[in-house]
Design a protein with these regions (language model features):
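Perimembrane helix-loop-helix junctions
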Residues: 169-172, 198-227
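Hydrophobic/aromatic-rich transmembrane helices and adjacent perimembrane loops
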Residues: 198, 319-322, 330-366
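C-terminal luminal/periplasmic domains and tails of membrane-associated envelope-modifying transferases
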Residues: 11, 418-424, 445-677
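Hydrophobic, aromatic-rich transmembrane alpha-helices
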Residues: 291-315
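Transmembrane-helix motifs of polytopic, lipid-linked glycan transferases
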Residues: 38, 42, 103-124, 159-166, ...
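Transmembrane-helix signature of polytopic, membrane-embedded enzymes
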Residues: 34-42, 116-139, 158, 177, ...
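Membrane-interface transmembrane helices that cradle and orient dolichyl/undecaprenyl
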Residues: 121-127, 147, 163-179, 189, ...
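Signature aromatic-anchored transmembrane alpha helix within multi-pass, membrane-resident enzymes
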Residues: 310-315, 357-396
Length: 677
């Protein structure tokens, strides 16, 4: 395909946009591609090893290390493949369990870089292109940042590149066996991290669409190979049934709990929670940061590689990689969490690949510029310098910032919090990092004595009730109807009431409520609710009584309109019409309760039969704050609610209740029943 133009622009066009009729260079010997890939993997592993974290690094790292060490169940989606493979690395004599899992991450990320090097060589025929692709991706700050700590993202990266390598092999010589390998790689990715579908699903669907003919037997076999790795999720209920110390989701207790755990419904509330402008701004900030890391040369090589791929016989793969990149950026940019960039880490795979392809296109296009023979002999040397200079620049930029080899701060904080806590204590912790530190301190390191650990986030889930001691459940049941802010504030109060006064209660809550007679002491970095000597025991002290000062009866409620049949998780309207006989005192709220299998007692509490173990008790779904309405006036409010998907199908009775803080009036049953299905 001739390219027209004059001057320097005509000379540069062969480099920036290679013609689609260009023949691929001869493939290098297999041993050379293997040696280049092995060298890239070892170089990356050496960098990761020198900056490897000696302990857990906070947040999910401590929990994952504890779950692997005790063979428990991690937070949604469970990560069964990580738990199984991580246990093999946990047996290595490398020090703490978190360090062993950090080495697992390093091996996974280094393997991903080596595989990416092989893919680039297979696509271009240039070993230097593979070296640059693997090192540019592996030494980026995003990949390096998760390759030297105990996290799940490095293994996700390896599985994504494995699927890409399987697709390239199938593309070179389409055959059913290679298609099955691609399907199995896609299934392994889904058995670990659900976002791998953004990368593997387009590749697998394109391979199926491009296969001619497509007999039913081929489709069935491909589907079977893709679904076979998903059987790993059965590991979660099997281990949950063994009652490990760390049992997120209680997946053996109910198929509904198992399904909610593996599909990550808990985190769906964070997805697509930012506007289009915020997503564009976030993606732009990430692009600017990566551009500063790679420099002008790296950005130019990526552009050349992308344009060259779209103009070559590998155009379908280029389009698929562009689509995967867009999906990852949309997902990560719209995810409302602080460290959202970790979900966009697989984007470095196509960027690194395009960088390597850009070098290959530049090396192939330079001879077309009619350079002198002396300069042409320097082309391989120049390519080698670029392939090494860009990764060297990346390593110099990130080494000091990403070096975790001396980072003991999370473990030191856990030691400061928990050292000296007696074995009969109850430890109530709020926040991911404090809970991860406690789980790692006691379950991974095996520190004793072991107190009762109670993460506040567990207390709001129905699957957690069967895992808790029976004497603890009433306290959580009383706090469950409260809004989240008040729940955190009053939970220590209710726990303190059911505890033996001599049993210490530790918490890191900022402002917990202190029961009468107790004092709040600062013990290390935690607060301790204690009963000073000489005061009466809990059995001798008056219990908290519900306040019944507000009148109840037909004068309060005029009517309620609720659809008779609702679908779980689907929004629906509720209309309340209230007549106030006198102004509502400041601070009082009107709450609507959905209860199943429960009946109000004369004392005002909601009694739940023990055989239901609180699984059928439904927390407060709606809170309606009433203003100081003049007496005799009507107040009408339209509520737009969303019933929890965790509610079991069946009939629910509606109750009305006035509350202020811990004070409750007796629930008033409404003439309305809702059926969830």
């Amino acid at each position: 395909m001739p390219l027209t133009g004059g001057g320097h622009r005509a000379k540069l066009l062969p480099v920036l946009a290679m013609p689609s009729t260009q023949t691929a260079p001869a493939a290098p010997p297999p041993w050379l591609a293997a040696a280049a890939s092995l060298g890239v993997g070892l170089a990356l592993l050496a960098c990761y090893w020198c900056t490897l974290a000696p302990s857990f690094t906070g947040r999910d790292g401590g929990e994952l290390a504890a779950a692997v060490h005790v063979m428990g169940v991690a937070h949604p989606t469970g990560y069964p493949l990580y738990l199984v493979l991580g246990k093999l690395f946990d047996l290595l004599p490398l020090g703490e369990p978190a360090r062993c899992l950090a080495f697992f991450s390093a091996v996974s990320a280094a393997g991903a870089g080596a595989l990416l090097c092989w893919v680039a060589i297979a696509l271009t025929g240039y070993p230097l292109a593979g070296v640059l692709a693997g090192l540019a991706a592996g030494l980026s700050s995003w990949v390096w940042g998760v390759a030297n700590q105990a996290e799940v993202y490095a293994l996700n990266l390896l599985l994504v590149v494995l699927a890409l390598a399987a697709f390239v092999r199938w593309q070179a010589a389409p055959a059913p066996r290679r298609l099955y390998l691609l399907a199995a790689a896609a299934g392994l990715g889904l058995a670990h991290h659900r976002t791998s579908l953004f990368f593997t699903a387009p590749l697998l669907l394109w391979a199926l669409w491009a296969t001619r003919p497509r007999p039913l037997r081929l489709l069935a076999a491909t589907t079977g190979w893709a679904c076979l790795p998903l059987l790993l999720y059965l590991w979660l209920p099997v281990r949950s049934a063994c009652h490990p110390p760390l049992n997120w989701g209680n997946t053996s207790g109910s198929w509904l709990w198992f399904w909610e755990h593996i599909n990550g419904s808990l985190y769906l509330a964070f997805v697509l929670r930012t506007g289009a402008a915020a997503v564009i701004s976030q993606v732009g900030a990430w692009g600017a940061a990566l551009g500063r890391q790679l420099g002008l040369a790296g950005v130019l090589l990526i552009a050349i590689g992308l344009v060259g791929m779209l103009r070559s016989r590998h155009r379908p793969l280029g389009v698929l990689l562009l689509a995967s990149t867009a999906l990852y950026l949309l997902w990560a940019g719209s995810y409302r969490v602080a460290d959202r960039q970790v979900f966009a880490i697989p984007v470095m795979i196509p960027l690194g690949l395009w960088c390597g392809l850009g070098l290959a296109h530049a090396l192939a296009g330079l001879p077309r510029l009619k350079l002198s023979p002396a300069l042409l002999r320097l082309v391989p040397l120049a390519g080698g310098l670029v392939a090494l200079a860009l990764p060297a620049n990346l390593s110099l930029q990130h080494w000091a910032r990403l070096d975790r080899s001396r980072d003991h701060r999370p473990l030191e904080q856990a030691l400061l919090n928990l050292a000296g806590v007696p074995g009969d204590a109850v430890v109530l912790l709020e926040g991911d990092e404090p809970n991860a530190g406690a789980e790692y301190y006691y379950h991974a390191l095996g520190r004793r004595p072991l107190p009762l650990l109670l993460p506040t986030e567990w207390a709001v889930y129905d699957w957690a009730y069967p895992l808790l001691p029976a004497w603890l459940r009433p306290a959580l049941a009383r706090a469950a109807p409260l809004p989240e802010r008040e729940f955190m504030e009053w939970l220590p109060y209710y726990l303190r009431e059911v505890l033996d006064p001599r049993r210490p209660l530790y918490t890191n809550l900022d402002a917990p409520r202190v029961p009468p007679g107790f004092v709040l002491l600062k013990d290390h970095a935690l607060k301790r609710l204690v009963l000073p000597p000489g005061l009466p025991l809990a059995a001798d002290r008056p219990r908290m009584r519900p306040v019944t000062e507000l009148p109840q009866g037909s004068g309060w409620l005029l009517g309620v309109q609720v659809p008779p049949v609702l679908a779980r998780g689907a929004p629906f309207p509720i209309r309340l019409a209230v007549r106030l006989q006198r102004p509502l005192p400041d601070g009082w709220d009107l709450q609507l309760l959905f209860l199943q299998g429960a009946s109000p007692s004369p004392g005002g509490a909601v009694m739940v039969p023990r055989d239901q173990v609180f699984a059928r008790r439904v927390p407060l779904l709606f809170g309606l704050a009433l203003p100081a309405t003049p007496p005799g006036r009507h107040y009408q409010q339209d509520l737009f609610g969303l019933p929890s998907r965790r509610l079991r199908p069946g009939a629910y009775q509606l109750y009305l209740q006035f509350c202020r803080g811990r004070h409750r009036t007796a629930p008033v049953p409404l003439a309305a029943t809702v059926t969830l299905r």
